[in-house]
Amino acid sequence: MKQIDFDHGTVIGNILGAALPMLVAQILSLLYNIVDRIYIARIPSVGTTALGAVGLCFPIIVIITAFSNLFGSGGAPLFSINRGKGNIKKAEAIMNTSFSMLCICGVALMVIGMLFASPILVLFGASEEGLSYAYPYMMIYLIGTVPSMIATGMNPFINAQGYATSGMLSVTIGAVANLILDPLFIFGLNLGIKGAAIATIISQTLSAAYVFYFLRKKAELKVRVLSKGEWKACRDDAKNIVSLGSAGFIMQLTNSLVTICCNSVLSGIGGDVYISVMTIVSSVRQMVETPIYAINEGTSPILSYNYGAQRPKKVKKAICVLTCMILIYTAIAWSVIIFEPEFLIGIFSTDSELLADCVEALKLYFAAFIFMDLQYVGQTVFKSLNKKKQAIFFSLLRKVFIVVPLTYLFPYAFHMGTKGVFLAEPISNVIGGSLCFITMLVMLKRSI
């Protein structure tokens, strides 16, 4: 199995070698998420309502993903840093601790989610009609919580060992399965929105099975569940994993919080149709962020490994490459969103009323999206170099202290209606992104 040489390869070569397979994997993953929504939106008679119902489930799905990344993205940089130092036993212990915590947390989230799914969805803004579609979708989705968390949380450990192609394959397996199963279950078996959920959990289970098989049988460092007697010895590892992973965890939880707040305000001001508008806007954002995520995650192990190996020049060069790649890509993506929004919206729905409302919302929401690049770069660097405090602070700043208050302030205090909800995002991009990037530059000057 081909492995990236972190010691002797060039910085640009290593980043591209890690990022390109991940980009392919993420595009396929995006496709199966997006295709899910495209098919759901085209269910006869109830498509728009069903699409909004799936949007109501997003916060719960994001919370599950956040816990996956708490242990996966928290453990993988520490794993890479210790590999860079040559401390292989420590690296292996970190991976096994992450895996064990993922499994335990997955079971707990599944049980809690199933017990409280209905009141949670109502709290998130579900109407009586919306709940009739969101509840069955969510209950089925929750069955696959553990496989979903293993597939998402353990894949970074495949990439961290330099097996970028295998990391890509793990995502590809689930994506292809979902692309095949979605139309079969939704339309062929006439299961509607329930069919979409069933297709998703089968696909996630296939991905998880491959990830576990590879890390158990093929990878250089092998994964296993910690024995009862090992937990005490790995307590410090668990604390460090959670501490570093808290930044990404908080960032995703705050994304979920923002979605909840937006849905709540939009439902009260604009009705269920604006829940569907927000679902489409969020879907476009997911499309745009996919290559950015691949570049970030492809760069992260290179940053961590060279930081652990005490090669500051390579660390700085990797940051420069990361920044340039993301800025160039985002400039192109932003131009498409601003000048051809109808094309992107049309991917998800042909509803004329929805299209008219979405165009303005999309342009407002993405007005200053280029400034988000600064946040992406800063957060990736903080996480990769084990700078926990900065990573956590900037995860909270943009969403909790800027977006959430403005989401309520603009529509109600300034009487801006639904426009105010979408305007909160670009303002937070400018303030949060700029402060995060400046802090990263100061940190690099002082400590590297």
Where are these regions (language model features)?
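N-terminal transmembrane alpha-helices
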Residues: 6-46, 59-74, 78, 103-110, ...
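Transmembrane helical elements of multi-pass membrane transporters/channels
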Residues: 17-36, 140, 174, 203-207, ...
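Helix-terminus/linker motif at the lipid-water interface of multi-pass membrane proteins
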Residues: 27, 31-51, 121-128, 184-191, ...
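Generic alpha-helical transmembrane segments of integral inner-membrane proteins
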Residues: 23, 27, 31, 35, ...
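Short runs within selected transmembrane alpha-helices of multi-pass transporters and secretion channels
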Residues: 69-72, 141-159, 167-178, 196-211, ...
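Short alpha-helical transmembrane segments in multi-pass integral membrane proteins
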Residues: 1-19, 79-144, 190-245, 303-368, ...
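Small-residue-rich hydrophobic transmembrane alpha-helices
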Residues: 51-111, 148-167, 263, 275-335, ...
